[in-house]
């Protein structure tokens, strides 16, 4: 993310439209003030003394400080995925933010207006913390104030309609019918209790509903998305395909293929893309690394993607056709087997030592890849346990503003029928994710 000191506010806000951070916050009931923090009109801000309020104060304090070391320390502890250069550029462009008003709040969310210290442009912000872990910010969203004013304001009828539609889709498509029934009952109880009554912001409502679905069901693959601009609904089978030009710009998720030492290959893979679009990139990367004695595959920042690409890369590691895993589809009541590819261009890496680096951010298809290679004893996993999401999903439009993503199946080992849902994939060598590469390199150097 790059910003310029004189860029327009819409362009600036586009950079941070889905800005997610993680903080450590406390809980209390009273309002409080932060020394040195003032409202845009010079008065003292009264921020609710709630988890959401504490989170807002903590972020503003770190962001507005202008102290690179302070922000680096903050990011290291609370938001290790944040790019310090990006934050520095954003801070230079805005000069920081002064609160203009607190427009609505609850324990877990807060909506506010702020002004940039450079130019005095108004932005609307919304922040949501997680229900089960209020130290974790689920959403921090900043958009131009004029664009926010054009959004719909949710009323009770709209909120109820979205929740009831979500309940119907959950009952129809969710992979575990018994869990779906219990989740629907608890969600309906929350609605009748008035848990969503004060939420009029679409983005906040979507995130709160998503969080409740995940907590009640225990399934991290649930997602609820909100679109301020009304979108034309589409069926899951006809949803837009990935943009090949954007994928090419991102190198199809292959961040780096390199030789760290003459005999140690390194592949940094951040997401799995469809082989129909990106097979040539995968083939080029694996061919480049084919002569390595040891291969390190870094999935610490891999959040998932297409299972077909995971199977393609796995195919370079096995000599014979190999049954990788099974995928159960609840909507069709079928089991689809995943095997390595029978033919591949280029050399294979059979017989070579393989390490896979994992973290708690490794998710979904990244976990499938790790799970398969571990169970087949084809790789040694190094790092932290993975995120714990083993369910493929499909989107369902509720209307032109809301879409719910429902898990409809599950990956599983073809022999044990086990998966990693909720628990993650445990590494063979457990070390902090930040130390995983050094640990793998150390062990690779010690190999005969």
Predicted regions and their residues:
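N-terminal secretory signal peptides that target proteins for export/translocation
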Residues: 1-22
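Bacterial N-terminal signal peptides
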Residues: 22-36
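Short, low-complexity N-terminal intrinsically disordered segments enriched in polar/charged residues
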Residues: 39-68, 146-165
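Short, well-ordered alpha-helical segments enriched in acidic and aromatic residues
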Residues: 62-82, 183-189
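Extended, small/polar residue-biased N-terminal targeting/export presequences
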Residues: 83-110, 177-262, 448
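Exposed beta-sheet edge and beta->alpha loop/turn motif
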Residues: 96, 103-153
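Solvent-exposed loop/turn segments at secondary-structure junctions
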Residues: 144-147, 228-232, 271-275, 301-307, ...
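Gly/Ser/Thr-rich loop/hinge elements
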Residues: 304-353, 391-398, 408-414, 424
């Amino acid at each position: 993310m790059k910003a310029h000191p004189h860029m327009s506010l819409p362009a600036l806000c586009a950079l941070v439209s889905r800005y997610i951070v993680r903080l450590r916050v406390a809980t209390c009931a009273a309002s409080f003030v932060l020394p040195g923090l003032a409202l845009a009109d010079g008065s003292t801000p009264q921020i609710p003394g709630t988890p959401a309020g504490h989170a807002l104060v903590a972020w503003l304090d770190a962001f507005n400080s202008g102290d690179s070391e302070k922000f680096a320390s903050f990011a290291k502890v609370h938001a290790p995925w944040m790019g310090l250069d990006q934050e520095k550029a954003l801070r230079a462009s805005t000069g920081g933010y002064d609160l203009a008003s607190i427009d609505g709040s609850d324990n877990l969310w807060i909506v506010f207006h702020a002004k940039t210290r450079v130019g005095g442009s108004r932005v609307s912000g919304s922040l949501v913390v997680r229900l089960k872990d209020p130290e974790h910010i689920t959403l921090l969203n900043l958009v131009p104030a004029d664009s926010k004013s054009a959004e719909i304001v949710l009323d009770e009828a709209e909120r109820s309609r979205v929740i009831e539609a979500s309940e119907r889709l959950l009952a129809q498509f969710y992979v575990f019918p018994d869990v779906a029934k219990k989740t629907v009952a608890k969600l309906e109880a929350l609605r009748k209790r008035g848990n969503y009554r004060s939420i009029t912001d679409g983005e906040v409502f979507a995130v709160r509903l998503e969080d409740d679905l995940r907590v009640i069901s225990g399934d991290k693959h649930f997602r609820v998305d909100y679109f301020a601009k009304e979108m034309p609904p589409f069926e899951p089978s006809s949803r837009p395909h990935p943009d090949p030009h954007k994928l090419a710009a991102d190198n199809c998720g292959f961040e780096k293929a390199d030789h760290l030492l003459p005999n140690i290959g390194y592949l940094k893979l951040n997401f799995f893309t469809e082989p129909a679009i990106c097979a040539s990139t995968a083939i080029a990367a694996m061919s480049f690394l084919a002569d390595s004695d040891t291969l390190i595959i870094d999935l610490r920042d891999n959040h998932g993607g297409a299972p077909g690409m995971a199977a393609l890369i796995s195919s370079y590691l096995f000599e014979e056709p190999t049954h990788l895993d099974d995928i159960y589809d609840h909507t069709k009541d079928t089991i689809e087997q995943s095997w390595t590819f029978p033919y591949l261009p280029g050399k294979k890496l059979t017989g070579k030592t393989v390490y896979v680096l994992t973290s708690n951010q490794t998710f979904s298809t990244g976990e499938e890849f790790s799970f398969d290679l571990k169970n087949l004893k084809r790789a040694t996993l190094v790092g932290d346990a993975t995120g714990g999401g083993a369910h493929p999903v499909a989107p369902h439009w509720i209307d032109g503003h809301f879409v719910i993503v429902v898990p409809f199946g599950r990956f599983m080992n073809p022999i044990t029928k086990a998966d990693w849902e909720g628990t993650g994939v445990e590494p063979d060598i457990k070390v902090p994710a930040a130390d995983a590469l050094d640990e793998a390199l150390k062990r690779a150097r010690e190999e005969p």
